Regions:
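Contiguous hydrophobic, helix-prone segments at protein termini
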Residues: 1-226, 230
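Short, flexible coil/turn micro-motifs enriched in small/turn-prone residues
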Residues: 67-68, 153, 223-225, 229, ...
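Mature hydrolase/peptidase catalytic cores and their serpin-fold inhibitory cores, especially
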Residues: 199-267, 276
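Acidic, glycine-rich flexible loop/linker segments
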Residues: 240-255, 260-262, 266-329
């Protein structure tokens, strides 16, 4: 049975854990920055001083630990074990808390509107999909901590130089399957070079092999289409920031976030954006779900957006029609 646009939008309006995270982060940042000494340690990016000041502020420490226990595994590239989490990357954590401390980010959760049984069923399980993503992220965070602990033991034994080197070994190298004397540690440097090489190019999202001929891994064609998927309704014009990787831009330096792809760890950055443009994704990708829930206009599927637009460009985002246009460059 066909479904009209209005019914489609209604179906996609469901609660997820993302709004809860953003609101708790906003509450936490404001509470921490009430304490002058804690705020100063964040501004100086001094993790030692931060921990010291947190120990003397019971309420702030309690709120911080509550957030970390619930959302500690949620950070950019959260499903990549080699990526530092928010407990390790204090600079990013400081930037995030300071940014949120001065912003109005109290988003309301989607209200339960009248709906049919099957609409409610869809929303229930679509929402749980996001819950499971958070559980997965937290589990990856736990596994990273365990891996780093093993890495530190390997460093003490002189087997590897850095604890992070553990991620370039095979699982059999650390679970006891292979004897320590038989592990080939030289593959660490080889795999690091391979890892850095594969970070240097962006292959096409999909390709086909015709008559046994493989296409180039490099996508040389620049698609100039301004049309994508209108993932979240609304219109906005503003300054763009183009991010190849996750980072917290300077306060008030941008309005529209443009990137290749996101994962749930980008939620905190999306929440302080007025518009979102993503090259890859679909109507149920995380960026789409978060944008709808937070009421931020978003267009997904604008090919080569990171090449066509530059940081500082003024662009127009139409989440209703799925169109993105450059106003000035």
């Amino acid at each position: 049975k066909g479904i009209n646009k209005k019914s489609h939008q209604k179906l996609l309006d469901f609660k997820s854990v993302s709004t809860k995270q953003v609101n708790q982060l906003s509450l936490l940042s404001k509470e921490l920055c009430k304490d002058i000494k804690i705020k100063k340690s964040l501004e100086e990016k001094n993790s030692t001083l931060f921990k010291k000041n947190m120990r003397r502020n019971f309420e702030a420490n309690k709120l911080f630990n509550s957030y970390i226990n619930k959302f500690g595994g949620r950070f950019a590239n959260e499903s990549k074990l080699e990526t530092k989490d928010i407990n390790e990357d204090f600079n990013s954590l400081s930037d995030l808390l300071l940014t949120y401390s001065t912003m109005n980010t109290n988003f309301k959760e989607s209200a339960n509107k009248s709906e049919t049984f099957f609409e409610g069923l869809f929303k229930k399980f679509a929402s749980r999909r996001e819950d499971f993503r958070l559980l997965r992220a937290n589990m990856f965070g736990v596994f990273r901590k365990l891996s780093i602990s093993i890495g530190k033991e390997y460093v003490k034994k002189g087997l590897i130089k850095n604890s992070d080197d553990i991620f370039y070994l095979d699982f059999e190298d650390i679970d006891g399957t292979i004897k320590m004397d038989d592990i080939d540690f030289s593959k660490i440097n080889i795999r690091k070079k391979e890892y850095n090489f594969f970070k240097t190019f962006q292959p096409p999202s999909h390709f086909k092999v015709a008559n046994g001929i493989w296409p180039s891994l490099f996508d040389s064609k620049v698609d100039q289409s301004n049309s994508g998927i209108g993932a979240s309704r609304g219109k906005v014009t503003g300054r763009a920031v183009v991010l190849e990787e996750f980072s917290i831009p300077e306060k008030d330096s941008f309005d529209i976030l443009i990137t290749r792809r996101t994962d749930p760890g980008w939620t905190s950055l999306m929440a302080i954006s007025k518009g979102i443009v993503v090259e890859h994704g679909g109507i149920l990708s995380h960026a789409s779900i978060v944008a709808r829930e937070l009421g931020i206009p978003a267009v997904i599927g604008i090919k080569n957006a990171c090449k066509r637009f530059k940081t500082g460009d003024t662009i127009f985002v139409d989440g209703d029609k799925g169109v993105v246009e450059a106003i000035s460059k």
